[in-house]
Amino acid sequence: MAAPRRYFPGIVRALLGAWQVGSHAGREWVSPPGSLLGNHVRCVSCVVGATFSGPLLASASSRYGQDSALDRILGFPQPDSSLVPCVPAVSVHRDEQNLLLVHTPDMPENPRVLRVVLLGAPNAGKSTLSNQLLGRKVFPVSKKVHTTRCQALGVITEKETQVILLDTPGIISPVKQKRHHLELSLLEDPWKSMESADLVVVLVDVSDKWTRSRLSPQVLQCLTKFSQVPSILVLNKVDCLKQKSVLLELTAALTEGVVNGKMLNVRQAFRSRPSTHCPGPETEDPNTHAVRSPQRTGWPYFQEIFMLSALNNKDVNTLKQYLLTQAQPGPWEFHSGVLTSQTPEEICANKIREKLLEYLPEEVPYSVQQKTVIWEEGPSGELVIQQNLLVPKESHVRILIGQKGLLISQIAQEVSQDLMDIFLCDVLLRLSVKLLK
């Protein structure tokens, strides 16, 4: 499959496909009038794509208008770096992505590296923050819990420094994992990622008044077991708080009044530094860490505190610059063209699942099975994707299709736009909803 053409964001075409009834998965049959749902296999397709007229050139950089890592490997001439975006695109080809992941890193003379684990309760905003730090929305995000089902990896490469982000599922207890029949990866991945971490970012959603005043027992257990790993505290979604004084109380509670081994004068720090990066405390208390309470609700070993709104990108760059400064001399793990370890098919499936979680009620999105049946180049050079969405109940079929097919059309259109932003190419997506038998 040749690489799809570069897309033009201003030209997006959405077509609602025909209603389909029949047992032939590869064909489209129009249903009889007045019989939208019968006793056959039901499915509805929605096609969303974009068109762009222009020549298909030889190298990826000329096609995409960006610096292609594979072009650098193959020796293609590169455009002026000042005219191209810094964030690499993800290849639409699995083989190219895998080749890039195992390719020898193009390290500078003095490389620096940092492995960062994002830790927090479910739905704290870890994936949203990861996307903001990376500069592309490669990780799925929704308001429902357990959107991230397994550990995902993102890579930030700037000049001599490479920061590797490990976006883990929300940390849960074994009891909850068994009770809700959740994947074992939701329980194990946060702990496994800590074994190779250089820095831990603990994320707390301050908009949740029920959980914001204390770290979860699972997070505290993880921090305690890996206490040798440096950690920082990030208070997320601070823009949701009407009374900023609440931040002072939360900071004191979540740090037990101690940051970087010193007593934290929260009020003085907040008055002297109105920015969202709280400076280290002023006076030292060497005996603070000697007491370990079994009822601990905070962690007194955080090196720094950051307050930000990941959704609005407020002060995310401040955190990013801090991470870059914490990198230590060492070899890079990935080529500078790597943005994520996910395959293009995984990114697509996760993006579709993100929209299902966002728009479908209650348990419905968790019952949907996804199956990609087409991933190929279209007649105009676009990336053509077809994915079947299998649901167990007729009522779920109707919910997912929506009135006159508007919901499935909206989902396909939004996913297509997200994929075009990630792959930097035309995307023609077809979603078919079918009753699982």
Swiss-Prot record:
It is found in: Mitochondrion matrix; Mitochondrion inner membrane. It is a peripheral membrane protein. CDD domains: Era, KH-II_Era. Residues 112-330 form the Era-type G domain. Residues 272-293 are annotated as: Disordered. Residues 1-20 form a transit peptide. Coiled coil: none annotated. InterPro entries: G_ERA_dom, GTP-bd, GTPase_Era-like, KH_dom-like_a/b, KH_dom_type_2, KH_sf_prok-type, P-loop_NTPase, Small_GTP-bd. SUPFAM superfamilies: P-loop containing nucleoside triphosphate hydrolases, Prokaryotic type KH domain (KH-domain type II). Residues 146-150 are annotated as: G2. Gene3D superfamilies: 3.30.300.20, P-loop containing nucleotide triphosphate hydrolases. The modification Phosphoserine is found at S173. GTP binds at residues 120-127, 167-171, 236-239. Its main location: mitochondrion. Residues 167-170 are annotated as: G3. GO terms for molecular function: GTP binding; ribosomal small subunit binding; rRNA binding. It comes from the Eukaryota. Belongs to the TRAFAC class TrmE-Era-EngA-EngB-Septin-like GTPase superfamily. Era GTPase family. Probable GTPase that plays a role in the mitochondrial ribosomal small subunit assembly. Specifically binds the 12S mitochondrial rRNA (12S mt-rRNA) to a 33 nucleotide section delineating the 3' terminal stem-loop region. May act as a chaperone that protects the 12S mt-rRNA on the 28S mitoribosomal subunit during ribosomal small subunit assembly. This is GTPase Era, mitochondrial. It comes from Rattus norvegicus.
